């Protein structure tokens, strides 16, 4: 009987050395996001973070999200450096809705076979997203799971914790008829609706490299999600924000009602903005009904803010100074009976 060949973890498809190389590669990206509250360095069993001392009654706000099937397009077109920004954006934009300042972020990267170059690109993007939002990247998990994912395909999940003063939590309770609604422009479809995007590409047999408004269609589709944290923190400090809605999965119809009292509805002026070209392309090439567009995509609006009507001019000026494209998109009205909570005129 011959002696069996000794087996290693690498023989089973898990390369510990590759994982160590990744950790070494991302140290600079992590260091760039460090906040003064962070204790310790990357690599501990748990990451430590103090609460900022400026808060009297700090309330922690948590969120988790992914990038969805936008990843499929990114993998197919080898565009790995911006999906990390998407991942952070989907989490921190949810936190800012409550008025919370993001504190720290953790990521989960799962793959069948770890490609160090690809993973480094992804995590560097996560670091960029954290930098844009003032959030510390304090840890994560890289899971190499042969047999669970095909080849070098990967999936991402993000986890974020923020903090808000208890008295300053934004929960929509101050929203009232007569409030104005301000829209903040999106950078594209962000990270929602990509199963429909991919279906439109399939049925239309369109060339993703075709020109659309001066750049390839695929570039429009893979544009990273806009992060609104820093500009909205300044708006919250300077104005009287009653509510904010992050326009993600479910579009206008489902996200705006999440922050409205039962006796209020949002009346949106559909002619107050022009849809970016990518949404018109999707609608036309997929023969998608307008209602379905507003249900699936942000249609050019990444965030909606409710505030008193007399605060609009100052708010728009502040947002413009922060580099945001913002405009008056509608108003809050009294809701009667079982009326829908969102009306687009």
Swiss-Prot record:
Keywords: ATP-binding, Cytoplasm, Ligase, Nucleotide-binding, Purine biosynthesis
CDD domains: PurM
Subcellular locations according to the entry: Cytoplasm
Metabolic or biological pathway, per its Swiss-Prot or TrEMBL entry: Purine metabolism; IMP biosynthesis via de novo pathway; 5-amino-1-(5-phospho-D-ribosyl)imidazole from N(2)-formyl-N(1)-(5-phospho-D-ribosyl)glycinamide: step 2/2
Gene Ontology BP terms: 'de novo' IMP biosynthetic process; adenine biosynthetic process
InterPro entries the UniProt entry points to: PurM-like_C_dom, PurM-like_C_sf, PurM-like_N, PurM-like_N_sf, PurM_cligase
GO-annotated cellular components: cytosol
Family per record: Belongs to the AIR synthase family.
UniProt name for this protein: Phosphoribosylformylglycinamidine cyclo-ligase
Source species of the chain: Shewanella sp. (strain ANA-3)
């Amino acid at each position: 009987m011959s002696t069996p060949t000794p087996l290693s973890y690498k023989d089973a498809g898990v390369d510990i050395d590759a994982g160590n190389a990744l950790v070494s590669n991302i140290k600079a990206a992590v260091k760039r996001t460090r906040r003064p509250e962070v204790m310790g360095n990357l690599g501990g069993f748990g990451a430590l973070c103090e609460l900022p001392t400026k808060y009297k009654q700090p309330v922690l706000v948590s969120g988790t999200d992914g990038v969805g099937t936008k990843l499929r397009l990114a993998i197919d077109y080898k565009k790995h450096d911006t999906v990390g920004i998407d991942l952070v954006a989907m989490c921190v934009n949810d936190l800012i809705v409550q008025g919370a300042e993001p504190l720290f972020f953790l990521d989960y990267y799962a793959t069948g076979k770890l490609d160090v170059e690809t993973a480094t690109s992804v995590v560097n993007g996560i670091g960029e997203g954290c930098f844009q939002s003032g959030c510390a990247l304090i840890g994560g998990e890289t899971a190499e799971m042969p047999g669970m994912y095909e080849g070098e395909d990967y999936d991402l999940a993000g986890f974020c914790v923020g903090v808000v003063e208890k008295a300053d939590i934004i929960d929509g309770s101050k929203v009232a008829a007569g409030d104005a609604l301000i829209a903040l422009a999106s950078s594209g479809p962000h990270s929602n609706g990509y199963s429909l995007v991919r279906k439109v590409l399939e049925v239309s047999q369109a060339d993703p490299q075709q020109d659309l408004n001066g750049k390839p269609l695929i570039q429009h589709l893979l544009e990273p999600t806009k992060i609104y944290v820093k500009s909205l923190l300044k708006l919250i400090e300077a104005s009287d924000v009653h509510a904010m809605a992050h326009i993600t999965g479910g579009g206008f119809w489902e996200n705006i009602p999440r922050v409205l009292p039962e006796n209020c509805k949002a009346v949106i002026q559909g002619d107050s903005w022009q849809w970016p070209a990518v949404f018109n392309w999707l609608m036309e090439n997929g023969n998608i009904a307008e209602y379905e567009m507003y249900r699936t995509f942000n249609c050019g609006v990444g965030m909606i803010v409710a505030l008193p009507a007399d605060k609009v001019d100052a708010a728009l000026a502040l947002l413009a100074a922060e580099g945001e494209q913002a405009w008056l998109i509608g108003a809050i009205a009294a809701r009667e009976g079982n009326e829908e909570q969102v009306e687009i005129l």
